[in-house]
């Protein structure tokens, strides 16, 4: 199936590494296992500081679903268990042993029954890689998904391409074969043919995939690479019982690597990007999953007060505090550095704005349709919060036809029934990142949707499963 998306915004932000950039290798001293994505689920910690762990060792367990573990990607020693407000689990920090783990696993995918395969996924931390729709929560083992969507079309700013992720392996063919094994495992686990969404420029091993998966291509501006867009065009979610799972290309590689090679895939590709980073420092690295920023960034840049650190891309990533020695998030493959101006731009309202981004033609750049690299992207809000006046501008950049402003208003009043009627079942917080970015009212739509989905899932979805 060929999908063409016309709505969205083709972001060309300054600070991206060159696609041909060299993949250097960094073996970090510290890594963390990010537990923030599991906020809807109560977790039980299985380790304490000073415990020795190996790759694949259980670090945390779903309290409501015993036997489902979140595991360590590396060998090392647990040094800290970080908690936030109300003692919410944030991450488990590990002092990594040098080198790659040699902990060997032996699973024969062909001989495992579907029931045994599920136990392997739960025990080895593979089930924790899936996300569940509606409500964009960690997948629940009690649910049988209608469909599984595998995303190879992610086009968020600065996100490494599929080709870059294949740099982890000896050859592109080797990487794709590992991916095929991962797809085979998913197809057998759920007894279905998953949907694989890629772009036209990717050359997939279609002969190996066509018998075990549905293959689709998508073309269009950001956010055409979001799972919500794929689900909407291929098989829409129409009610709360319409459960689908989503998973990324990198996570399928982790599944295939365990079954084919017998080792936990503890490494990942990371992009160092952002307009605050000198061009010579914008590059791709091969490093451990969850690596600490201090091991990946130059000391003078990491400690600068004039730079904002983000784990992930600039639109959906997590804002990090330097004093906490931040680490990469669980699903993050980018470290973004943006300038943090201390003063407002003088007479900004009188400037032509040739290099400024606008959707409403507030600046001169809005009258030119040619693709341009927008300069000097920083954390300046350029004003304070205002009432929402023009609701139509959000629909121009939303890849799926949902009334963005009406959903936000329903969520702000906690009217979940109305929000679901308007399309909340089809969306995730990331779908509101672009409306938040171009919003003249400065409303934090991304945060509103994220907090609302978390609250609703805790009260209605997780407890009833």
From Swiss-Prot:
Protein keywords: Ion transport, NAD, Sodium, Sodium transport, Translocase, Transport, Ubiquinone
GO biological process, one term: sodium ion transport
Catalytic reaction list: a ubiquinone + n Na(+)(in) + NADH + H(+) = a ubiquinol + n Na(+)(out) + NAD(+)
One Gene Ontology MF term: oxidoreductase activity, acting on NAD(P)H, quinone or similar compound as acceptor
Enzyme class at the top of the EC tree: translocase
Matches recorded under InterPro entries: NqrA (IPR008703), NQRA_2nd (IPR056148), NqrA_C_domain (IPR022615), NQRA_N (IPR056147)
The protein's Enzyme Commission number: 7.2.1.1
Transport is among the record's keywords: yes
Top-rank taxon, per record: Bacteria
Pfam families: NQRA_2nd, NQRA_N, NQRA_SLBB
Quaternary structure (record): Composed of six subunits; NqrA, NqrB, NqrC, NqrD, NqrE and NqrF.
UniProt function note: NQR complex catalyzes the reduction of ubiquinone-1 to ubiquinol by two successive reactions, coupled with the transport of Na(+) ions from the cytoplasm to the periplasm. NqrA to NqrE are probably involved in the second step, the conversion of ubisemiquinone to ubiquinol.
HAMAP family named in the record: NqrA (MF_00425)
UniProt xrefs under PANTHER family: NA(+)-TRANSLOCATING NADH-QUINONE REDUCTASE SUBUNIT A
Protein name: Na(+)-translocating NADH-quinone reductase subunit A
The species this protein was found in: Chlamydia trachomatis serovar D (strain ATCC VR-885 / DSM 19411 / UW-3/Cx)
Name of the coding gene: nqrA
